[in-house]
Amino acid sequence: MASTHESISCITFEFAADVSALVHMHASALGDQCPPVRIGFDDLTAAYRFVPCSQPQYTVFCVWKPAVGTAPGGPAFYYVPGHNFGMAAAVLNFNRFPKLMVAMARSTLALPVDQYFDDYMVVDLASAGQSGQDGLSFLHRLAARPLDKDKHQCMSAANEGLGVTIDVSAVHTDGKLIVRCRWHRCATVLFMLREARDANFLPPGTASTIHGKLGFILSAAYGRVGKAASQPLVQRMWRDTDYCFTPELHHMLEFFEALLPELPALTIDVGPSRHAGPPVIVYTDASFSAPLVNGERKRVAELGYHVVVPRQGHPPRMLYQSVRLDDEALRAFSSTALTLIMQCEIAAATWVYYSAPDLFRCQRVIHFIDNTGALSALLHGYARKLECARMVNAFHLLAAALQLRVYFEWVPSMANVADLPSRSPEKGAMSAYHAMFPSAVPGPSFLPPLGSWLPGGALSLKAVFAQYGSWVASSVSYS
């Protein structure tokens, strides 16, 4: 099987954000307000057909035409100019032409333009009008490779391209660029999943198609919310031997039926950063034991957090809290398992954000955890155990609702200061904590019942929407 040693790098909607951020930066350096920005798209006409290849003799093919009535049969020859779709080298060779045109437009016209295969994205000042696209079109006419007039999208405050709607209308006022996924893409994914559910059959090929479509959709959602829920598709693609619609797939479908119609737009901050100050520091920990009580194992867990909130010109504010989970509460994870520490660590890491949503809203956070399993699940957005995956879904859903940017980091257990609040019933634990942090005060605590953490998908998702309000910052309306 032939392969190539070259590859290409495609742009995303982030190109528009990069240009917008540069406009903001240079306007600020000049002491001016940011001017309005506009975005437009163009497309090459019959792209693969207009770019020649070095072996045109191989683009001729022959089929046998059967005799019909009095018309004689015989060979019929067809010539396909340019590049053939499906050939490994065709993409690489074709891509050289639009790359060349982008380089020409940038160097001769100072035009902020880039390309995604045969699609061009132009991001320019509103005061420039259509001049950027006119210049790009002129260069293509010089190269005898015209742009497609039917696919031309004039410079505007919002346009559809690369599978999403890119809105730059708030760049100069609020320093924000908004990206929304097209609804028909969401509807297609839901339709395919419902068909598989009704047939109780999801083969690996279909799972791969759905997974690819979901990846594209979620790339334009805040924090790629919902990524965790798509992991049953990966399991089906590579490991499952039974192709029935499993409980994990049912849970995934319920999640996306609630999420996709309410999919949060991606808001990219391109102005002077709201997050210029230091981040909030979070430590969470959990302890778990199953002592014998009257000859019966009684499981119990204690969750703890330690939060450092920076204050400009003042010492940071320190908050701590703990909450106890008895055997009855832990039955939401398992009724028999004697080791539930990973589940409790994930619960602790999510509980801190449920407890103080207004404190964390729109903040950068550095979150320290000493359990590598919980850390991996929260970082990568998936856990193989269903109850862990549900909590990870809940965390990422909450992070999107609060517009959080969380950086997870491992910390050795002996250095995790949340270890003491998570062992608050033990003698001397809190005395040692207050000796280290005399200014720390109790923080809020709210832990939803573990059994309600997305057990049925849509119902509890809507409860999260209701509790935490709009998906997006209140200062900008994207409806």
Model regions: which residues?
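Catalytic palm subdomain of template-directed nucleic-acid polymerases
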Residues: 2-6, 50-53, 111-145, 165-174, ...
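Active-site palm subdomain of RNA-directed nucleic acid polymerases
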Residues: 91-139, 352-369
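RNase H catalytic domain
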Residues: 114, 124, 354-418, 423
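C-terminal reverse transcriptase regions that engage the nucleic-acid substrate
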Residues: 156-272, 419
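RNase H-like nuclease fold core
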Residues: 274-341, 355
